[in-house]
């Protein structure tokens, strides 16, 4: 009984695998069939890789003469050239977007490009290595080499599919940013045009007014302008007055300081001169007194 259940389970699982696997294989190419040149080029690379993975006799023959690796190289370069062209096209549309946002998106996109190129190069290099092993065999059977290559190719295809999806998503984000920047630029132009239309409407309204009203309007504008100029002049005059007061105060302060220094210099000098003069007078008086004769008593 247990053996019967085991057989039924194995049969169901095999049937499910048979139903799911072809569906996955059919869904994979639809990821890059939106019509962009780079997606079409990647689709050609993918289709050629699926054909190589069959390892038919023709594939074996072309692998041995390096035709497969040459064809993969051409398809890889075509794909990356189209990716670069599409990226440059989107960069031109990213003009109004902020520079930091543009730099961040560009860096992320370059990383996705590098990963996709590395995947395709690894596929090509793996097939070239298989071709070398087939030529020398190295004591291994062809079936063993084919089985190992098939396992490697399945892993590489999964990685290639994952990185292709990542690149596709990042390009979509890049395109959305370009569209947003373009819409923002159009909005700015629309606002500018609206402002110009409003100004034209005001000019037309002023032109249609009577001459007296227009003169009054211009008079009001001129009066406002004169008041503004007068206010600025008064402010400037006040500033000059304050500066003059500051200069006057500084000059007076410096004059007082200079006067104090002069007084400090001359007062000791005058005091010394007065003292010397007093000494001189005293000496003269003494000298005069000593030289005057005393009157004689005989006379």
Curated annotation (Swiss-Prot):
- Predominant subcellular localization, coarse grouping: secreted
From the Swiss-Prot or TrEMBL record, state where the protein is found: Secreted; Secreted, Extracellular space; Secreted, Extracellular space, Extracellular matrix; Extracellular vesicle
Please give the residue ranges the record annotates as the region Lipid-binding and lipoprotein association.
Answer: 204-273
Q: Where is this region: LDL and other lipoprotein receptors binding?
A: 152-162
Region ranges (8 X 22 AA approximate tandem repeats): 74-245
User: What ranges does the record give for the region Specificity for association with VLDL, renumbered to this chain?
Assistant: 261-273
Sorted alphabetically, which keywords does the UniProt record give? Chylomicron, Endosome, Extracellular matrix, Glycoprotein, HDL, Heparin-binding, Lipid transport, Lipid-binding, Oxidation, Phosphoprotein, Repeat, Secreted, Signal, Transport, VLDL
What is its quaternary makeup? Homotetramer. May interact with ABCA1; functionally associated with ABCA1 in the biogenesis of HDLs. May interact with APP/A4 amyloid-beta peptide; the interaction is extremely stable in vitro but its physiological significance is unclear. May interact with MAPT. May interact with MAP2. In the cerebrospinal fluid, interacts with secreted SORL1. Interacts with PMEL; this allows the loading of PMEL luminal fragment on ILVs to induce fibril nucleation.
Hey, which family's this protein in? Belongs to the apolipoprotein A1/A4/E family.
Tell me what this protein is called. Apolipoprotein E
Q: Which organism is it from?
A: Heterocephalus glaber
**Taxonomic placement:** Eukaryota, Metazoa, Chordata, Craniata, Vertebrata
Q: Which gene encodes it?
A: APOE
